[in-house]
Amino acid sequence: MTESGRIPLWLVATVAGMGVITLLGIFFYGAYAGLGSAV
């Protein structure tokens, strides 16, 4: 792989994937917590 001062694609994909998983986790946790407290 030739790096020309750019951010590696795998690093971008990893950070983006972790961000999406974190957002999904927070969203589902918030929905579950809200559901549990509402019932």
UniProtKB/Swiss-Prot annotation:
GO-annotated biological processes: photosynthesis
Annotated compartments: Cellular thylakoid membrane
Keyword entries, A-Z: Membrane, Photosynthesis, Photosystem II, Reaction center, Thylakoid, Transmembrane, Transmembrane helix
Function description: One of the components of the core complex of photosystem II (PSII). PSII is a light-driven water:plastoquinone oxidoreductase that uses light energy to abstract electrons from H(2)O, generating O(2) and a proton gradient subsequently used for ATP formation. It consists of a core antenna complex that captures photons, and an electron transfer chain that converts photonic excitation into a charge separation.
Gene3D superfamilies, per the entry: 6.10.250.2070
Name listed for the protein in its UniProt record: Photosystem II reaction center protein J
Annotated family: Belongs to the PsbJ family.
Subunit structure as annotated in this protein's UniProt entry: PSII is composed of 1 copy each of membrane proteins PsbA, PsbB, PsbC, PsbD, PsbE, PsbF, PsbH, PsbI, PsbJ, PsbK, PsbL, PsbM, PsbT, PsbX, PsbY, PsbZ, Psb30/Ycf12, peripheral proteins PsbO, CyanoQ (PsbQ), PsbU, PsbV and a large number of cofactors. It forms dimeric complexes.
Signal peptide location: none
Annotated transmembrane regions: 7-27
